[in-house]
A protein has these predicted regions:
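Non-catalytic accessory segments flanking enzyme active sites
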Residues: 1, 76, 96-192
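A flexible loop/linker signature enriched in serine peptidases of the S9 family
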Residues: 3-12, 26-41, 52-62, 76-86, ...
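Residue-level detector of Asp-centered blade-edge/turn motifs that repeat once per structural unit
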Residues: 18-19, 68-69, 117-120
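Hydrophobic beta-strand positions that form the internal "hydrophobic ladder"
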Residues: 20-24, 72-73, 123-124
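Short loop/turn segments that connect beta-strands within beta-propeller blades
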Residues: 44-48, 89-93, 140-143
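Long hydrophobic segments that form regular secondary structure
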Residues: 70-72, 92
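Hydrophobic beta-strand anchors of alpha/beta hydrolase catalytic cores
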Residues: 195-197
Length: 197
């Protein structure tokens, strides 16, 4: 066994390139902070020539998957309450491919989500919106996504869901913007008062 990494901080989720010559992995240098973005690293399979390929990308990277030719990786990230699927080339260029990656549980759909990539680059992923639980969507040739299932039609024909609104607040401490979500009750009437939970 040979140790390939030694930075002060975690290194994890290693993925070997299709030709076996490179290793992509996630990690970060531990600066003893509450949160630090997961960074995408690349090195030779010998452990040499370690580089950061996501250096200019200001979001935490998860779920890395090599493309079939070894020219880049697919991954997921969260941005402003929305989980996304993206592609990063080995020179660090990021291309967003899909929004609304979501989980398969009704109670907490934002907590997960998954995708799969075929050798030809076709992507299938769990697509979720506040107004419906997850469905499957497909992306071909890195173009726009298309829903391919309607699994929740029966459920939604018998339920009325509350409308979800994105709201932003300004911090009184440092002026930063803070994102929030307001879900109004089903059959909401603006002339009535409702408890805030």
């Amino acid at each position: 066994i040979k140790v390939l990494t030694s930075q002060k901080g975690p290194d994890f989720s290693p993925k070997v390139s299709p030709n076996g010559k490179k290793i992509a992995f996630l990690g970060f240098k531990d600066n003893v902070q509450t949160h630090q973005n997961r960074v995408l690293y690349l090195m030779n399979s010998s452990g040499k020539n370690r580089t950061t390929i996501s250096g200019n990308f200001d979001n935490s990277i998860s779920n890395i998957v090599w493309d079939s030719l070894g020219n880049g990786l697919y991954f997921t990230y969260d941005e402003k309450g929305n989980s996304k699927v993206a592609y990063i080339s080995l020179n660090g260029k990021v291309t967003k491919l899909a929004d609304n990656l979501g989980g398969t549980t009704i109670g907490r759909p934002y907590a997960s989500g998954s995708f799969s990539v075929a050798k030809n680059g076709t992507i299938v992923y769990t697509h979720t919106r506040p107004e419906y639980p997850s469905e499957l969507a497909v992306i071909k040739d890195k173009k726009s996504s298309k829903l391919i299932t309607n699994l929740n039609e029966d459920l939604l024909s018998r339920k009325v869901l509350g409308k979800t609104e994105e709201v932003w607040y300004t911090s009184s401490f440092d002026g930063r913007k803070i994102q929030g979500w307001l879900v109004k009750p089903p059959f909401y009437d603006s002339r009535k008062k409702y408890p805030l939970l």
